[in-house]
Amino acid sequence: MEKWASLDSDESEPPAQENSCPDPPDRDPNSKPPPAKPHIFATRSRTRLFGKGDSEEASPMDCPYEEGGLASCPIITVSSVVTLQRSVDGPTCLRQTSQDSVSTGVETPPRLYDRRSIFDAVAQSNCQELESLLSFLQKSKKRLTDSEFKDPETGKTCLLKAMLNLHNGQNDTIALLLDIARKTDSLKQFVNASYTDSYYKGQTALHIAIERRNMALVTLLVENGADVQAAANGDFFKKTKGRPGFYFGELPLSLAACTNQLAIVKFLLQNSWQPADISARDSVGNTVLHALVEVADNTADNTKFVTNMYNEILILGAKLHPTLKLEELTNKKGLTPLALAASSGKIGVLAYILQREIHEPECRHLSRKFTEWAYGPVHSSLYDLSCIDTCEKNSVLEVIAYSSSETPNRHDMLLVEPLNRLLQDKWDRFVKRIFYFNFFVYCLYMIIFTTAAYYRPVEGLPPYKLNNTVGDYFRVTGEILSVSGGVYFFFRGIQYFLQRRPSLKSLFVDSYSEILFFVQSLFMLVSVVLYFSHRKEYVASMVFSLAMGWTNMLYYTRGFQQMGIYAVMIEKMILRDLCRFMFVYLVFLFGFSTAVVTLIEDGKNNSLPVESPPHKCRGSACRPGNSYNSLYSTCLELFKFTIGMGDLEFTENYDFKAVFIILLLAYVILTYILLLNMLIALMGETVNKIAQESKNIWKLQRAITILDTEKSFLKCMRKAFRSGKLLQVGFTPDGKDDFRWCFRVDEVNWTTWNTNVGIINEDPGNCEGVKRTLSFSLRSGRVSGRNWKNFALVPLLRDASTRDRHSTQPEEVQLKHYTGSLKPEDAEVFKDSMAPGEK
């Protein structure tokens, strides 16, 4: 008894990680102990939240505090400790053995391990605590991948726990755990174990090592069989609006690329154990290039690292897989990385891809821009139109023009070359003439519609009989043409809404003109129905259609820059300032009208005698014969106050004159003085604010008109009017001729000179000794036309590409000061080059 008491006194202050509960000496060691004393301070239970319908707090990937304490964990025994097992809900009692029992020669029981003890050891990077783990697993025939050694809620293993608890970038237990897993024949399963909860589902140790930017651990894991194609597709790794998380493309390669770790990217692609597939896609079909576009945010630093990483991966992929066209792979939405950058408004990445020019001979086929010639600051560049022009599905022009109004940088992206010059080329060559012709036809249609409406019959009920007169024949012809135009606009509007399917917000922002044309056609069709229904109300619907028809004339101002910008300002002021003004004004009008109507009482003073002729009445004593005790009449009178034409004594049929005057004065102050002046101030501010924005919006509207006109052509006509020209710009990696549909843009750049530019033609404006004509203009920006008739470019491009293939030096023009003497062969070169100029 004294011995037990002494032991109890020694264990009165147990360590923080152990619970000691001494029993009395006369108690059976196997009996159930009394319940443990509860903690004085109640701990808040932490709930793991993974689903979208759960609380806003998301569970962390790792936490130093394990849930459930020791209640749900098996017992832990140490060789120098005798463990008394209790029930699952009770604590575990630990008692030290006496020196006599140790000296008796009784065999010391092996140490037992559970999830808690292993997790604590790896979190502290304590390898000594895991020395007996291998023997324990071998004797118990267990593995580290068994469910009892995993977190029951997240599926986290001790390896994942160790990866999340690095000390100075390393954890000594990781190599030990991998060695134990190898000796228990569970290495591959252990190293590829991932989270199983919905929030971090699929994340493996390799993902964590890459996220921790630890090259040594990445190498160690890949050497031990880590799956380089493991996909982390939990909710945290998805691009969900309004939820925290980080989308990187799910795959380890994409994670390394999106976190700017080029060394790990190269290792994953070039290691000898398990190279990553550079063309692998995630659950939404995005490749590593798509993922880079997704993480771009248009800031300077982010755009710089994304474009550099994009370029490195593209070149590395070309060297590893020469025939793979990585940039042409599409996701499940059918978008290439270029189209994805356009649809998401990543203007920095978009400009880089469109203007990418690689000078390395073995990777020059990756370029989308080829410098034809350069002279001083002037560069003549050939832009590859693949995935840009409307001849291909999901082209960049269509994606930008028809994208949602919420797309950032939507207007500015059309100013990036070659998009800006390409649209201008289409407008100058054929769209401009078609647009002006449509404008003329619409003006003629409105004149016919107006004439037919003005000379309509006024006697009798419709439909009216046709008299055998020239005037009636012209009138009926005009009516038929007017109705035909209404039917055309109706079906064109239906086609537009079915193809574009705009949202409610973009419907009033981007589809402003289409809505007006559609409403005009609806009024026309309603007028036709009322006309044949013997109702004279057809006139009301017809005049509304007529008024909207002339208003829609503003649509054709987009063909003229100054008028187009002015029309955009009117549209923006209507949608922004005027709509807000009308909402507040209608609230005031309705509120004060109901108050005035309630105050007015019908009486003889409120109307004129019947015998008084209205047209002879003058002054405030003359009032119309209707009663003002109606909301309609009162609203009309109050509206007159808004425009400064109201009369404070428009009626005298009230009992509280002071209240009546106060209501009218308050209405005048709030509407005529406050709201109208505020509207004028807001309109002036809007004009100043959107001056430059209006120009870009006008360019976007004109771009939509250009694409709509081009889409109305037959397929054969589209090819005939296609901008650019098919040219050979070099050779493909498999040795075939590399033909591209190119568009030439002449640029002036005062920062980039022709010292380090891969130039196709040595002589500016002179190809194979044939000079260009003086009709060449830097403003043309076109490949087709007379600029291409004066020289043969394809043979020269083929020769330039051949020189690149047989030469180890890249083609660069080096301007150096020459101090030596000329050799004979140099003289021959100069003589040949000067010969054309001397002729």
From Swiss-Prot:
Which amino acids does the record list as binding Na(+) 2? G644
Gene3D superfamilies, from UniProt? Answer: 1.10.287.70, Ankyrin repeat-containing domain (1.25.40.20)
Q: ANK repeats span which residues?
A: 111-139, 154-186, 204-229, 250-277, 286-322, 336-359, 394-416
Tell me the outcome of changing T634A.
8-fold less potently activated by the Scolopendra mutilans RhTx toxin
Query: What is the residue range of the motif Selectivity filter?
Result: 644-647
Keywords from UniProt, A to Z, are:
ANK repeat, ATP-binding, Calcium, Calcium channel, Calcium transport, Calmodulin-binding, Cell membrane, Cell projection, Glycoprotein, Ion channel, Ion transport, Membrane, Metal-binding, Nucleotide-binding, Phosphoprotein, Postsynaptic cell membrane, Repeat, Sodium, Synapse, Transmembrane, Transmembrane helix, Transport
A single GO molecular-function term is: extracellular ligand-gated monoatomic ion channel activity
Family according to the record: Belongs to the transient receptor (TC 1.A.4) family. TrpV subfamily. TRPV1 sub-subfamily.
**This protein is called what?**
Transient receptor potential cation channel subfamily V member 1
* Lineage per the UniProt record: Eukaryota, Metazoa, Chordata, Craniata, Vertebrata
